[in-house]
UniProtKB/Swiss-Prot annotation:
It comes from Escherichia coli O127:H6 (strain E2348/69 / EPEC). It is found in: Cytoplasm. The gene is iraD. Keywords: Cytoplasm, Stress response. It holds the Pfam family GPW_gp25. This is Anti-adapter protein IraD. One of its GO terms (cellular component) is cytoplasm. Inhibits RpoS proteolysis by regulating RssB activity, thereby increasing the stability of the sigma stress factor RpoS during oxidative stress. Its effect on RpoS stability is due to its interaction with RssB, which probably blocks the interaction of RssB with RpoS, and the consequent delivery of the RssB-RpoS complex to the ClpXP protein degradation pathway. GO terms for molecular function: anti-sigma factor antagonist activity. Belongs to the GpW/Gp25 family. IraD subfamily. It comes from the Bacteria. The keyword Repressor does not apply.
Length: 127
C-alpha cells in the first residue's frame, strides 16, 4: 500500500492575531473610502462640496454627517463592536475624520484617522 502525504503549511501563531485584525480593519475601512465602487453613500465619501463655504461651520450638518457615517461603517464592517466618529478639522478643502473604535476579540481601543485633501482620502497611522 502506497501512502501519500500532503504537506500543509499552517500560519504561525505569534500572538500578532490582534495586530493583523487591527491592520485588516484599517485597510478595509480605507478601501471603503477610497474605492470608486464603494458601497458607502457617495455623499459620505466624497461630499466635500457640503463643507465648502458657509456649511463648514454648521454643527448640525457635522453632527448629521458623523451619525450617517457611523451607521454606514457599522453596517459594512462587522468586526467593529463600538464606533465613535468625530470631525477633528473641517476646512473648505480639507476634512479630518477620527474613527475611535473597539473591535470584537480585541481589548484595546483603535483610533483611525482619515484626511480628505486635494480631492482624495489619505490615512494616518492607527494608534
Amino acid at each position: 500500500m502506497m501512502r501519500q502525504s500532503v504537506q500543509t503549511v499552517l500560519p504561525e501563531s505569534t500572538g500578532n492575531n490582534t495586530l493583523s485584525l487591527r491592520d485588516s480593519v484599517c485597510r478595509d475601512l480605507f478601501q471603503l473610502f477610497s474605492s470608486p465602487h464603494s458601497p458607502l453613500p457617495i455623499l459620505l465619501v466624497s461630499g466635500m462640496p457640503e463643507w465648502q463655504g458657509h456649511n463648514q461651520s454648521d454643527k448640525l450638518l457635522q453632527s448629521w454627517y458623523c451619525r450617517q457615517l457611523r451607521s454606514a461603517l457599522l453596517f459594512h464592517e462587522p468586526r467593529i463592536a463600538a464606533l465613535q466618529v468625530n470631525l477633528k478639522a473641517v476646512y473648505c478643502h480639507e476634512l479630518v475624520i477620527s474613527l475611535d473604535m473597539m473591535l470584537y476579540h480585541d481589548d484595546e481601543p483603535l483610533t483611525f484617522d482619515l484626511v480628505w485633501q486635494k480631492g482624495s482620502w489619505h490615512r494616518t497611522m492607527p494608534q
